[in-house]
Amino acid sequence: MDVFVWRLGDQGAAGTPAVDHIQNFATAAAGTNATGGDVLDLRDLLLGESVGPSNGAGNLADYLHFEVSGSDTLVHVSHTGGFAADAHAVGAGYTAAQETQQIILEGVNLQSLYSGATTDQQLITQLLNNNKLIVD
């Protein structure tokens, strides 16, 4: 299991995000066994985020937007919650001028992995429930 950590200050400026590529992101649920999956740790990067009841998405869709491009998943991040006015549908438009970090999961299609997840909120909830995402 690998934990990929982003800290406040790692991000780029709004509209010119820092871009990180992750290869071989293990998609198994994290914490289930010694060969559990990898984890994205954004708790120090995101400012003012909250998780909803029962590991719900809370306001995290204001911070995270997901897009599938070929066989990759692009995680667009606004560390200050700048996506609040967006539609929050996977692959829909988002406020690129607010993006400060982009995480590319190479060879991973999260929408296919979590079949039926068509909104950012649904993907976030799946990631939280599978211990794949750490936030405050």
Question: What are these regions, as identified by a protein language model?
Answer:
Residues 1-60:
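Acidic, glycine-rich calcium-binding repeat modules characteristic of RTX/beta-roll
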Residues 61-136:
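Low-complexity acidic/polar repeat-biased segments
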